[in-house]
């Protein structure tokens, strides 16, 4: 029997060097496809976070900031572009590691690596553009003053990222933070840290100055919590669950520390009766089953017009049964395992609860018959939903789509907004004006028209309501990591003249 593919053995990345964790502990890496242990990651703790934050602070202040924080954006851009080039050079290796680590189909993981490189390139451009934005003048009503603005890095930032897009979600935070001149400590999810540690290797290879990016892997309570509460961290950016987001806000509050939160979702996709059914079916399934259904923005609540519901559901079942569920490294895989046994059991519980509450499982909901091991769940479509059901209200984070019918546009809007979340939404219709109306009516940070899930680093990303606040990516993405300073100068030769001058002796 062939031995399992193993992941590289790495340490923590602190101050430009590999360091063993202070307490010497390590966590197993489990391949969700085979359930086999394929390596280990270091289990960092508060001592390691302290060292990483100290390294980041030293890098920020080195040479009074001239080496990084106050260096021209063009200097930082060179490093970001070098990282992007190395990611592309190592794309096959990185994509395979991500497939092994979190179960993502290889083709998706390879696409993610292109996006990782593209994001570093984009924020390299933004770093250079920042040079041109410096000292921008402000028009004032008094000619005796002139004013300009400086945009300065906010400082040391703590970045806490999830396991569904391990390297890409980390890049969404690292690239703009470094472009802005910040230094950073990254704490990736303990369920998928492998490619983030390989990013550290890339940073070392391209000569990124020591301490600019530090990576501490480990459990949330042991490493993430000390990072978010650290008094020498100036900002925290987090992507993950609503419950963890609340804890991060609470830990930041005593220091009035800014946070950016991208949390959960239960996003709607609204399909009207004027669509090409097969095109709409494919986008509907892609919107929910992409990345094995583990997407914050998954459009996992399908609202389908009553007139076409029966035919649409039949075609969805046919398409879903045609999705290749397999080892992520198999050619043509379109659905791999969910990331861990814990997630697997949680998703199965959601499905069984829905069934016990009266919902109908149209297809899926079980392990594929041909896969004896691994955390696999067939693409699942559930109907006969009521709006009080758990499956309608709670984020499943797996390949589970729930379906509800509507008759009027107003009803569709009401159902679409019947959620505590507001990350994304989609509408599919041949009526452009109707699509425009719904894009305005749905309460979410991102709306897709006649598609679902496309995401580009050139456009802002973030949610409303319990999906968090702040926007990443886009031209404003770098501003998350900048502090604006106004510099106002009195330019008149005349004295100010507010106080009466004392008599000269």
From Swiss-Prot:
User: What pathway is this protein said to act in by its record?
Assistant: Amine and polyamine biosynthesis; betaine biosynthesis via choline pathway; betaine from betaine aldehyde: step 1/1
Residues noted as binding Na(+) in the record, renumbered to the chain: 101, 191
Identify which residues the record assigns to the active site: 262, 296
**One of the protein's GO biological processes:** cellular detoxification of aldehyde
Q: Which GO terms describe its molecular function?
A: 4-trimethylammoniobutyraldehyde dehydrogenase activity; aminobutyraldehyde dehydrogenase (NAD+) activity; betaine-aldehyde dehydrogenase (NAD+) activity; gamma-guanidinobutyraldehyde dehydrogenase (NAD+) activity; nucleotide binding; protein homodimerization activity; sodium ion binding
Q: Where does NAD(+) bind?
A: 161-163, 187-190, 241-244, 262, 395, 461
Judging by the UniProt lineage, the source's domain of life is Eukaryota
Is Protein biosynthesis among the key words of this record? no
Q: How does it assemble?
A: Forms homodimers.
Q: What is this protein called?
A: Aminoaldehyde dehydrogenase 1a
Organism whose genome encodes this protein: Zea mays
Q: Which gene encodes it?
A: AMADH1A
């Amino acid at each position: 029997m062939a031995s399992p593919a193993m992941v590289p053995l790495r340490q923590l990345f602190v101050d430009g060097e590999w360091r063993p964790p202070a307490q010497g502990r390590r966590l197993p890496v489990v391949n969700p496809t085979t359930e086999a242990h394929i390596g280990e990651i270091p289990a960092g703790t508060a001592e390691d976070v302290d060292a990483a934050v100290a390294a980041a602070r030293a890098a920020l202040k080195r040479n009074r900031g001239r080496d990084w924080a106050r260096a021209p954006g063009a200097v930082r851009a060179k490093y970001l572009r070098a990282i992007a080039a190395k990611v592309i050079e190592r794309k096959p290796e990185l994509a395979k590691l991500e497939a092994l680590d979190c179960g993502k189909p290889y083709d998706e993981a390879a696409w993610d690596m292109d996006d990782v490189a593209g994001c570093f390139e984009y924020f390299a451009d933004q770093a250079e553009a920042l040079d041109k934005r410096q000292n921008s003048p402000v028009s004032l009503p008094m000619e005796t003053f002139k004013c300009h603005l400086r945009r300065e890095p906010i400082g040391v930032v703590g970045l806490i990222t999830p396991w569904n897009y391990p390297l890409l979600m980390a890049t969404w935070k690292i690239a703009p933070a470094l472009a802005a001149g910040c230094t950073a400590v990254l704490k990736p999810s303990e369920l998928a840290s492998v490619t983030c540690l390989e990013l550290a290797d890339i940073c070392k290879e391209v000569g990124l100055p020591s301490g600019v990016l530090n990576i501490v892997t480990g459990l949330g309570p042991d490493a993430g919590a000390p990072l978010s509460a650290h008094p020498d961290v100036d900002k925290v950016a987090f992507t993950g669950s609503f419950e963890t987001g609340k804890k991060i806000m609470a830990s930041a509050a005593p220091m009035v520390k800014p946070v950016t939160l991208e949390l959960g979702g239960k996003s709607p996709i609204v399909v009207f009766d004027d669509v090409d059914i097969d095109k709409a079916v494919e986008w509907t399934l892609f919107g929910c089953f992409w990345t094995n259904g583990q997407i914050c923005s998954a459009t996992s609540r399908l609202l389908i017009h009553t007139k076409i519901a029966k035919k649409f559901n039949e075609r969805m079942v046919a398409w879903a049964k045609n999705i290749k569920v397999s080892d992520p490294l198999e050619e043509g895989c379109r659905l791999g395992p969910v990331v861990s046994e814990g997630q697997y059991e949680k998703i199965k519980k959601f499905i069984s609860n829905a069934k016990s509450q009266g919902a109908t499982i149209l297809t899926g909901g079980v392990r594929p018959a041909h896969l004896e091991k691994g955390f696999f769940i067939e693409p699942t479509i559930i109907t006969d939903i009521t709006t009080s059901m758990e499956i309608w209200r709670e984020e499943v984070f797996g390949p589970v789509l729930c379906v509800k019918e509507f008759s009027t546009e107003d009803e569709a809007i009401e159902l679409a907004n019947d959620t505590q979340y507001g990350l994304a939404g989609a509408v599919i219709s041949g009526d452009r004006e109707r699509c425009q109306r719904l894009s305005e009516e749905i309460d979410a940070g991102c709306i897709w028209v006649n598609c679902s899930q496309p995401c580009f680093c050139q456009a802002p990303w973030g949610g409303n309501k319990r999906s968090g606040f702040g926007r990443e990516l886009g031209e404003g993405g770098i501003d998350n990591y900048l502090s604006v300073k106004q510099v106002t100068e009195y330019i008149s030769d005349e004295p100010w003249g507010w106080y009466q001058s004392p008599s000269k002796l």
